[in-house]
Amino acid sequence: MTYTKHDLKEAITRKLRLNYGCTEQQASDGEMLKACAMVLRDIMAEHGVESRQKAAREGARRVHYLSLEFLMGRSLMKNAYNLNVLPQLQEAIEELGFKAADIFDMEPDAGLGNGGLGRLAACYLDSMTTLEIPATGYSICYELGLFKQKIVEGQQVELPDDWKPLGDAWLLPKPQETEEIHFGGTVRTRWDNGHLMVVHEDYTRVLAVPCDMEIAGYDTDHVNTLRLWDAKSPKPIDMKLFSQGQYLRSGEERAMADVISKVLYPEDNHYEGKSLRLKQQYFFVSATVQSITRQHIQQYGTLKNFHKKNVIQINDTHPALVIPELMRILIDDAGLGWDEAWDITTHSVAYTNHTVLAEALEVWPQQLFETLLPRVWQILTEISHRYQKKIEEYYHGDMEKVGRMAVIWDGAVRMANLCIAGGMAVNGVSALHSEILRKDVFHDQCVMEPDKFKNVTNGVDHRRWISQINPRLDALLKDTVGEGYLTHADQMKGLERWADDREVLLRIGQIKKANKENFAKWVFRQQGAVLNTDAIFDVQVKRLHEYKRQLMNALHIIYLYQQLRDDPNMAFTPHTFLFGAKAAPGYAVAKRIIHLINSLADQINNDPVCKDRLQVVFLENYRVSMAEMLMPASEVSQQISTAGKEASGTGNMKFMMNGALTVGTLDGANVEMHEVLGDENMFLFGLHADEVSHLQRSYDPRLLYERDPMLRRIVDQLKTGFADGVSYEDLWRRLVQGADCPPDQYMLLADLPAYAEAEQRMVRAYGDAANWNRMSLINIARSGIFAADRSIADYADTIWHVPYKK
């Protein structure tokens, strides 16, 4: 069905009257936003019912995508775009007396994620829906998200991200489908006629109330669902305590339940934080598995065919408890024997690994499981025991290998090993990452079960990250290769036919210039910074982590600043460095790097020598809606992680799609970008992954520091500090001497000279505008391989074994 401007106007005014008791003349901008959202939600809900009925009629295998994060961004424009009603909606809003741009702009980013993991999940939901795969995403309905970042005196301050008051219009509460989760208590078991009987007593009950967010696909009536679980206590407040004036105590149990869905990634450097994180993860997977199995039984009457009709994809290790929880339901509730339950589980669950960093491969203390999840602990010990026997048999009792591969070892529960033991497939997210998993991180498991290990290189929603956010580039692509690129991203390759067309190259440059000016206006409105739009926009935006090497970028800027101070009259191409990053609240070093970047920015931006030449701006509270403004305006994409440390990256793909050129290491998906672009269309530098691995054994950054006066001068600036009087000697020590870690753990000093040289090559290339635009065009044309549609097709073909719209 098509919807006209008149249809939408009528539906919006009806929502305003029925839900807010007001006319369009009386409505606030917030009420207008929510009314628009509810109108689109109704359209999607209707399509959603039809999509689920169709899948049920066909007996289709369903995909269940579990992720602790879904970084959805704003949904009003995206849903209107996918439903093919965006122009009509904009006109309807304007004719009702509102500015459409203001209404779209006031929508908060949904606080359901943090970084690349969550954004990937959001892109994949869009592609699964567009490809008409019956799928449901599952996560937690966080009340306050991660946090809203404020920069105060150069330092990160975390504020609550209260997104729901304006963002909850997309949510459809389904209290009738509430699930009950049990924590703590004791477990008794007994055998009765050959069946294991399990009695769980004295547990604490928490309710998981589902709130569904409908997901529209592009150019299809198919709609999928993102199911978000909200934690509630089944107990009312204690009226006796309340009447005695003990108001806080009267609601204590309710508050303890509510806190489970309060924030994403609560700080876990103390016992209470660890306990809350584990509660979150079990709450999430238990509610999800109960919901999936309940729906399956309603349709098929048995769980014996569960694996034939369902596949559960777990995005990183956070949902790993889906394995013992599915076993619990199959054994305790459905009465299946262990072997049959294990066969079903290991043909239902697949695991995507997203990291090679040891600290990110989740490990939990045994005691937490024994206390919080006694029945799950029993199942885990049995899984571990049986898997250990399998390892011992295969490796002839090699206890070193057993120790590395075991699920439970030395009082610790290893979630990645659990995923490998209980999963039918394990995939990395770039060719290099998957190779490192096979050859290094999970080498022993791969030797034992080689067919389990796959690769699916990440991809991004190119409709959002080109067509929706960069309409000028979208128009160019439609003029040159046609609208087909929106559903078949490989057609973008056709743009290369225009690589030597003077008019097209000129247009590429004009598009970038206009986008830079738009972004500069937006930044000025947001934080008062005045960007030099005649300068190179050189951008590094991503989660703040030492391996991503924002500090190396800052050291290079110090080098440029020192050069300018030494010779104010030197030839210098104007250069604006843009940073955006959040540091985890408990990650002190990352917070210090943010402080350093802001100190450096303050020094440079207030030095007359740097005026109109060198500029540094830290973009506060980096988020999806900011990225949508920034990506089209960016000219240089910094992808400079230590080789072998970044699993894939998706920001690199979005920059490439928008014509930014990459300065980067051969890490993650940069490797595959290099395969399609070659040396001539990106600026590579630095050690390769195997060189990093080899050098680590003998690496001594102090020798580099002592032998190279220029390097020493740059690094010593950390001790000296800047005009604000803050010293960064702690970061200096971390690089030169080591502090609770090996010195220069991520090899910044080893790569810094090569990085500076790559930046010089980039600046020289920028001086030839026609050739730069040609390189930009080639990046755009060859980026189609990184579309999420391709990734989802790979999952469907190699892991899920489900059909999809070609």
Summary of predicted features, one role per range:
Residues 1-806:
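A conserved ligand/cofactor-binding region detector
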